From Swiss-Prot:
It comes from the Eukaryota. Its main location: nucleus. GO terms for biological process: meiotic cell cycle; meiotic sister chromatid cohesion. It is found in: Nucleus; Chromosome. The gene is HORMAD2. It comes from Homo sapiens (Human). Pfam families: HORMA. GO terms for cellular component: centrosome; chromosome; cytosol; nucleoplasm; nucleus; synaptonemal complex. The keyword Transmembrane helix does not apply. Keywords: Chromosome, Meiosis, Nucleus, Phosphoprotein. Phosphorylated in a SPO11-dependent manner. This is HORMA domain-containing protein 2. Residues 29-234 form the HORMA domain. Essential for synapsis surveillance during meiotic prophase via the recruitment of ATR activity. Plays a key role in the male mid-pachytene checkpoint and the female meiotic prophase checkpoint: required for efficient build-up of ATR activity on unsynapsed chromosome regions, a process believed to form the basis of meiotic silencing of unsynapsed chromatin (MSUC) and meiotic prophase quality control in both sexes. Required for the DNA double-strand break-independent, BRCA1-dependent activation of ATR on the sex chromosomes that is essential for normal sex body formation. Interacts with HORMAD1.
Length: 307
């Protein structure tokens, strides 16, 4: 299903009046708007190319020669409404400078198994000027440093989306039934204890990911506006990826592909580990004690009979 939809999603559109991102970024407000749109566009690309929701749940926007599908409110599809509320919750936490990381996770066992199929991680960091956003669908990236001009920011954004599209095309199709959730992690020092964005509740701060088979970690991209930056990563089982390395390296940029666990935050200063028993991916280390972070999570969304 995802492959079939791809041909509709990536189309050449030479004369476009509607654009995805602002043409100029000169202050923090414009930068925040850019990061929000890049985040929402990334989530939309993932859900569309993985075939999670019907065509009616998407509108169309344009980015250079790409015709993108962007999630919109579709009352006939409750699942898409849930995702939009999650995105809006992330926006609120971003505006308040609370959000450290948003993790979108896909499971394929509706009976309650916690075995992960795919994970997309978005990290956010805040500088004196503003925030930085890392999108980790577990890889790395084309990097443009803070303070670069608008053209460089646009190039980095377009390349990130293109590489995300390539990655989605190279993943095996999902089964008919999928369970979706998103966890939000915060900066404890600035986030009120009782803070919860709309659509979220207090969550469990777990650093373990359980895969059936060995996972692969792919850093897709990094974009910096001078006020905010975004990094993109993806994690899935290595056996589910089709010719990923060859296709990503066609994009004249650096792409890191590694068999490893989640990236540790700089604050945590600990190493990644994969425990071979059941391929449990963990960010925890016996040599690294970490403070318990505040986490929010929504009700999981079950998406049945996608075909």
């Amino acid at each position: 299903m995802a492959t079939a939809q791809l041909s509709h999603c990536i189309t050449i559109h030479k004369a476009s009046k509607e654009t995805v991102f602002p043409s100029q970024i000169t202050n923090e407000h414009e930068s925040l708007k850019m990061v929000k749109k890049l985040f929402a566009t990334s989530i939309s690309c993932i859900t569309y190319l993985r075939g999670l929701f019907p065509e009616s749940s998407y509108g169309e926007r344009h980015l250079d020669d790409l015709s993108l599908k962007i999630l919109r409110e579709d009352k006939k599809c409750p699942g898409s409404l849930h995702i939009i509320r999650w995105i809006q919750g992330c926006f609120d936490a971003l505006e308040k400078r609370y959000l450290r990381m948003a993790v979108l996770t896909l499971y394929t066992d509706p009976m309650g198994s916690e075995k992960v199929t795919e994970m997309y991680q978005f990290k956010f960091k805040y500088t004196k000027e503003g925030a930085t956003m890392d999108f980790d669908s577990h890889s790395s990236s084309t990097s443009f440093e803070s303070g670069t001009n608008n053209e460089d920011i646009k190039k980095a954004s377009v390349l990130l989306i293109r590489k995300l599209y390539i990655l989605m095309q190279d993943l095996e199709p999902l089964p008919n039934n999928v369970v979706l959730t998103m966890k939000l992690h915060y900066y404890n020092a600035v986030t009120p204890h009782d803070y919860q964005p709309l659509g979220f509740k207090e969550g469990v701060n777990s650093h373990f990911l359980l895969f059936d088979k060995e996972p692969i970690n792919v850093q897709v991209g990094f974009v910096s506006t001078g006020f905010h930056s975004m990094k993109v990563k993806v994690m899935t089982e290595a056996t589910k990826v089709i010719d990923l390395e060859n296709n990503l390296f066609r994009e004249n940029s650096t792409t890191e592909i590694a068999h490893q666990g989640l990236d540790c935050d700089e604050e945590e200063e600990c190493n990644d580990h994969i425990q071979r028993m059941n391929f449990v991916c963990s960010q925890q280390s016996s040599e690294c004690s970490r403070k318990k972070r505040k986490v929010s999570e929504p009700v999981k969304v079950f998406i049945p009979n996608r075909k």
